[in-house]
From Swiss-Prot:
Keywords: Adaptive immunity, Glycoprotein, Immunity, Immunoglobulin, Membrane, Transmembrane, Transmembrane helix. This is IgW transmembrane form Tm2T7/Tm7T7/Tm3T3. The chain crosses the membrane at residues 25-45. It comes from Heterodontus francisci (Horn shark). GO terms for biological process: adaptive immune response.
Length: 49
């Protein structure tokens, strides 16, 4: 419980300038783009069939 509260405290502090946060945002952006491209690809394949 102590570890969880420490993590929550760090999240609440919101160190947006940290490298970890930049990597996290970049990772989510890449995942979002990949999922969007994948869904578009699947839709195109279904239409062609």
């Amino acid at each position: 419980e102590d570890n969880l509260s420490d993590l929550e405290g760090k999240e609440e502090a919101g160190d947006w300038d940290g490298d970890d946060n930049v990597l996290t945002v970049a990772a989510f952006a890449i995942l979002f783009i990949l999922s969007f491209l994948y869904s578009t690809f699947v839709t195109v394949v279904k239409v062609q069939q």
